[in-house]
């Protein structure tokens, strides 16, 4: 999130997020940002218009079995990661809390097989409970403040089917102290919560982006049958 963004956009996002957090509506500012962008992707700090490179790398190196496998993309933004999974053969549902983001995905990919829906990660539909073979979570948890972190992690884990996997891409921080977000990178103890809610870590890669002073991880978790 916010990689190499102009200072004024970064400042604007921080302001929007700060007001939303003060009102205890931490997800409310995303719709404002998408609406105000008026179709200009340069105004969406995380929009790369391509799948995340660590997802691409995972798909290339793991060659996952995708036929009739149901995938869920959390906080799908403008849809590039969802499209990459669909291209590999997954039956993809992708959701975001922002109706404007979802409409934007449908406009960008009119022939897509992805089912794009508006939904709230903190109030997921009951039929999604443990329903997905592959869950992709990229840079959404870090975009929400620490006071909702446990609930967010529980919700992300809750949609993983028995035998299914979660692929997580996120920034991490080295201390337990509260960072000045957004983004709010995850701590070691927060990552541990995935295991406390029934998942087991299968693979973890750490990426240091020293020019940005950013540490990211890509972790694959599995829910045992
Ligand atoms: C930092 S962006 C990341 C988007 C995308 N995952 C990526 O990596 O490009 C966070 C996304 O999460 C969405 N979001 C925020 N709160 C949410 C919630 N409670 N439920 C679902 N989506 C949410 C936002 O609208 C936004 O598209």
Residue ranges and their predicted role:
Residues 136:
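A conserved beta-strand element that flanks and buttresses the S-adenosyl-L-methionine
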Residues 1-72, 77-128, 144-159, 163-225:
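Class I (Rossmann-like) S-adenosyl-L-methionine-dependent methyltransferase catalytic domain
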Residues 133:
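Conserved acidic residues
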Residues 139, 143:
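Short catalytic micro-motifs in class I SAM-dependent methyltransferases
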């Amino acid at each position: 999130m916010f990689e190499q963004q102009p200072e004024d956009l970064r400042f604007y996002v921080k302001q929007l997020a700060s007001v939303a957090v003060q009102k205890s509506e931490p997800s409310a500012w995303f719709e404002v940002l998408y609406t105000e962008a008026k179709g200009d992707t340069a105004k969406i700090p995380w929009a790369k218009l391509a799948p995340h490179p660590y997802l691409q790398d995972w798909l290339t190196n793991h060659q996952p079995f995708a036929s009739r496998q149901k995938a869920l993309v959390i906080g799908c933004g403008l849809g590039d990661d969802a499209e990459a999974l669909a291209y590999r053969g997954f039956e993809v549902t992708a959701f975001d809390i922002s109706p404007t983001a979802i409409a934007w995905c449908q406009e960008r990919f009119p022939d897509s097989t992805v089912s794009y829906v508006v939904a709230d990660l903190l109030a997921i539909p009951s039929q999604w409970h443990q329903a997905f073979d592959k869950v992709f979570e990229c840079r959404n948890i870090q975009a929400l403040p620490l006071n909702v972190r446990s609930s967010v992690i529980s919700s992300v884990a809750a949609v993983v089917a028995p035998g299914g996997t979660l692929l997580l891409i996120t920034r991490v921080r080295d201390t337990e102290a509260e960072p000045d977000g957004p983004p709010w990178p995850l701590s070691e103890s927060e990552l541990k919560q995935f295991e406390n809610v029934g998942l087991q870590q299968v693979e973890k890669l750490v990426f240091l982006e020293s020019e940005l002073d950013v540490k990211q991880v890509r972790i694959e978790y599995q829910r045992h049958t």
